[in-house]
Amino acid sequence: MTLDLSKPATAGYLSGFANEFATEALPGALPHGRNSPQRAPYGLYAEQLSGTAFTAPRGHNRRSWLYRIRPAAVHRPFEPYAGAQRLVSEFGDSADVPPTPPNQLRWDPLPMPVEPTDFVDGLVTMAGNGSAAAMNGCAIHLYAANRSMQDRFFYSADGELLIVPQQGRLFIATEFGRLDVEPFEIAVIPRGVRFAVALPDGNARGYICENFGALLRLPDLGPIGSNGLANPRDFLTPQAAYEDREGAFELIAKLNGRLWRADIGHSPLDVVAWHGNYAPYKYDLRLFNTIGSISFDHPDPSIFLVLQAQSDTPGVDTIDFVIFPPRWLAAEDTFRPPWFHRNVASEFMGLVHGAYDAKAEGFVPGGASLHNCMSGHGPDADTFEKASASDTTKPHKVDATMAFMFETRTLIRPTRYALDTAQLQADYFECWQGIKKHFNPEQR
């Protein structure tokens, strides 16, 4: 099976989360009984791609063996890349990262580019924390593009890329095979995996959380039991597919927040077979099994957790990826929207589709908001008044929505670009100014 991004994929996927997969595009391309034979089938080269330390515990160890036409080392030397100058990977004080205000922040969608712009050149860093060099924290990027990647390929050595499309499908050709991803789905490209992105719908826009630290995993379910939230079988990994092309190609690498380019005389998407548990995957957010209260109160948003990156502190994650999908609300005598909140964690939100049930207006698909550590937030004035007077004896369906959140244990620091851009809503704070005083000490 070969790669062709000019049309939708016809191959199926491999089902499961972090399984030990084995797949080949040519019969017998996978060596039998060993990883690195003296001579691999079809004249291929054996190459291991390690996503964790060799000595990581078996349950956390991630690696794959790739059988490819040429090793990944075959390319010309890298040199600085002149494009995509709005990326940041170090989130200490700098010209790119000014002092972080405690204000609630919200942005309109990133505009579509006027000039031809592909996925790589359409990247801009909005915020983040930690350090790519120290392999902790994350960077939160937006992308807006209107052209497919042409004879160029990209990888990030800084972290795994959690991609959340908001507008336009992405046909992603990777070393492991192909992922077709549309809005309402997510894709995760592991650190180091080379890929190219085609835009079948012309324009594309979305969000990326680049995870510098421990790999994303499914959360433990605790009292929920053995099923629920994001079920492992619904995660899809590509089957092996390759292209054997020679020509003048460009390989772009992201290392320590900077982009580098190298000439390469062949397509690096030349893996004919592979096996292992370190591979790209996608997931349809519409398959999320939402948990909620059927008595009273609005549970904590941790019930909406899709993926987590764990820290060295039990119960505290470096990154939580949370969604707010369509769902039924049935709690009686309860304020049903998300409540007013101050959080030790920091919250970057985006909206894929529809409206968010805590904001009547201003938060639109493609937009974003940031509520940092201990910054008060919650429903706007209109939402509060309506929800306080609604009939809670009847269930209500929150429909036509798909919001999400990147939540982190440490401060999410907006970049200079994010604080200076015209998309920043200077009047965001006004949505709470109309909240009325109802207190009356004479009337309970």
Swiss-Prot record:
Assigned GO CC terms: cytoplasm
Keyword Iron attributed: yes
Catalytic activity: homogentisate + O2 = 4-maleylacetoacetate + H(+)
This protein's record includes keyword Transmembrane helix: no
Pfam families: HgmA_C (PF04209), HgmA_N (PF20510)
Residues engaged in binding homogentisate: 356, 377
Keywords for this protein: Dioxygenase, Iron, Metal-binding, Oxidoreductase, Phenylalanine catabolism, Tyrosine catabolism
Domain of life: Bacteria
Cofactor(s) required for function per UniProt: Fe cation
Catalytic residues of the enzyme: 298 (proton acceptor)
Sequence positions that bind Fe cation: 341, 347, 377
Family matches, as InterPro entries: HgmA_C (IPR046451), HgmA_N (IPR046452), Homogentis_dOase (IPR005708), Homogentis_dOase_bac (IPR022950), RmlC-like_jellyroll (IPR014710), RmlC_Cupin_sf (IPR011051)
Molecular function as annotated in GO: homogentisate 1,2-dioxygenase activity; iron ion binding
GO biological process annotation, one example: L-phenylalanine catabolic process
Coiled coil: none
SUPFAM superfamilies registered for this protein in UniProt: RmlC-like cupins
Record pathway: Amino-acid degradation; L-phenylalanine degradation; acetoacetate and fumarate from L-phenylalanine: step 4/6
EC number, as in UniProt: 1.13.11.5
Enzyme class: oxidoreductase
Protein family: Belongs to the homogentisate dioxygenase family.
Annotated function: Involved in the catabolism of homogentisate (2,5-dihydroxyphenylacetate or 2,5-OH-PhAc), a central intermediate in the degradation of phenylalanine and tyrosine. Catalyzes the oxidative ring cleavage of the aromatic ring of homogentisate to yield maleylacetoacetate.
Assembly notes: Hexamer; dimer of trimers.
Protein name in UniProt: Homogentisate 1,2-dioxygenase
Species of the source: Burkholderia cenocepacia (strain HI2424)
